[in-house]
Amino acid sequence: MEQYKKEFIEFMVDCGVLKFGDFTTKSGRKTPFFVNTGFYRTGAQLRKLGEYYAKAIHDAYGLDFDVLFGPAYKGIPLSVATAMSISEHFDKDIKYCSNRKEVKDHGDTGILLGSPISDGDKVVIIEDVTTAGTSIGETMPILSAQGNVDVVGLVVSVDRMERGQGKKSALKEIEENYGIETTAIVTMKEVVEHLYGKPYNGKVVIDDQLKQAIDAYYEQYGVEA
């Protein structure tokens, strides 16, 4: 596992984004872990988060693209922070763009925020955690309306590696339904691999009991890597 992935996993723990315990998802599943990206709340945290996204994008897709598109609302700061990080660490000036959920009737009435998207642009979509394809289903028509746009791929922070309504993961369903590549900074398999049985800040984050609960969850809801 790459070093930046290990650092990102620990970063999520430090920020309180990655939690372990007893949770219930929106779909009603009982889960022993939860990822809440709403806990990235400071400038320093967003700067680091942008760095991890930038490295994941560079590894998966390279930098031969024009625009980072972050769907409203959580994708807005992600697109900004990551575009800044790509400029700083890879010396590549990438445009950022997001959409409005509400239509304005005054001033700038366009649906897009940030850079416009032009015919022929190559776009990478950036999101937080994808557990269903709802957001991408709203995003693709917005991009298509801008012209002949080439969607290079989708990047999320964590791939939960669990089934949606069918037998495949949400990211795999997106790949098949929309014909685009997907990637994540880390997968939950990598999270467990890095944290299981190892002390971090004086505490073992994933002990044997929690590991058994995670294994049982994936026995019921998991997908193949």
Swiss-Prot record:
Pathway: Pyrimidine metabolism; UMP biosynthesis via de novo pathway; UMP from orotate: step 1/2. Its EC number is 2.4.2.10. It holds the Pfam family Pribosyltran. It catalyses: orotidine 5'-phosphate + diphosphate = orotate + 5-phospho-alpha-D-ribose 1-diphosphate. Keywords: Glycosyltransferase, Magnesium, Pyrimidine biosynthesis, Transferase. The keyword Magnesium applies. SUPFAM superfamilies: PRTase-like. GO terms for cellular component: cytoplasm. PANTHER family: OROTATE PHOSPHORIBOSYLTRANSFERASE 1-RELATED. This is Orotate phosphoribosyltransferase. It comes from Lachnoclostridium phytofermentans (strain ATCC 700394 / DSM 18823 / ISDg) (Clostridium phytofermentans). The lineage of its organism: Bacteria, Bacillati, Bacillota, Clostridia, Lachnospirales.
